[in-house]
């Protein structure tokens, strides 16, 4: 039986934003997952990811940042993004019946989650679906300082051809993070996990990435 998706809203302090729950029966954990800079929570990648990871007993809460709700292209100021993340996390925690709540997201969504956790948001773990370590063409300017303040388990799913994550940069950061971090490379994958010569739609890509994330989430929840 397919678990239904339930729509809701979250009050963020900058106005309500849309949200979507998928809660499979007997879920072992909740993963709050945020979209990347150029897409909203209903992008096929996000929807496919949430639907597929539910098959592994993981509930998900997806949500929009305010700029997406308003039809804008440019992301909100960092303070608004972080406040939205905190509101979404608290909403998830209040509805998870004591289950572990993890945080994560695609690119921007995952980066803001990591900043919130570094500053105290009590997630049980972090799942990065293409972490943006640096701007394309600027691997010398790595955005990693706050990662070393994080004490919960982290999973980095990264395409090896991602212009935001040169493999040598990823390896260096992971060495410094030590056992707190796990790395799952997607061979030939770009920032959207597309692999040249292997055409798939975004929903299928999201589903395949969920298969990589699910074992980590279940393990953090003590159900792996």
What are these regions (language model features)?
Residues 149-151, 156-158, 162, 186:
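Short beta-strand/loop motif that positions the catalytic acidic residue
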Residues 85-150:
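Primarily recognizes the serine-hydrolase "nucleophile elbow" in alpha/beta-hydrolase
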Residues 189, 197-224:
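Catalytic active-site module of serine/aspartate enzymes centered on a nucleophile-bearing elbow/loop
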Residues 176-194:
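Catalytic histidine neighborhood in serine/cysteine hydrolases
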Residues 160-165, 191-192:
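Acidic catalytic loop of the alpha/beta-hydrolase fold
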Residues 8-101, 193-201:
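Serine-hydrolase catalytic machinery in alpha/beta-hydrolase-like enzymes
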Residues 46, 143, 152, 165-174:
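Short alpha-helix in the alpha/beta-hydrolase fold that links the catalytic acid
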């Amino acid at each position: 039986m397919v678990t239904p998706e339930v729509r809701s809203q979250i009050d963020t302090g900058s106005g309500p934003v849309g949200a979507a729950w998928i809660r499979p029966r007997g879920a072992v954990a909740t993963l709050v997952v945020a979209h990347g800079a150029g897409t909203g929570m209903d992008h096929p990648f996000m929807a496919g990811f949430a639907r597929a990871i539910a098959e592994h007993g993981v509930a998900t809460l997806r949500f929009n940042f305010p700029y997406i709700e308003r039809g804008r292209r440019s992301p909100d100021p960092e303070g608004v993004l972080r406040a939205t993340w905190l509101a979404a996390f608290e909403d998830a925690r209040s509805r998870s019946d004591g289950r572990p709540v993890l945080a994560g997201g695609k690119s921007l969504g995952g980066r803001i989650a990591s900043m919130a956790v570094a500053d105290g948001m009590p997630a049980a773990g972090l799942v990065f679906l293409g972490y943006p370590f640096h701007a394309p063409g600027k691997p010398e300017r790595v955005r990693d300082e706050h990662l070393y303040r994080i004490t919960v388990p982290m999973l980095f799913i990264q395409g090896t051809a991602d212009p935001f994550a040169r493999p040598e940069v990823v390896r260096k950061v992971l060495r410094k993070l030590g056992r707190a971090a796990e790395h799952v490379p997607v061979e030939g994958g770009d920032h959207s996990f597309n692999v040249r010569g292997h055409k798939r739609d975004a929903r299928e890509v999201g589903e395949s990435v969920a298969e990589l994330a699910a074992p980590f989430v279940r393990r953090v929840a003590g159900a792996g």
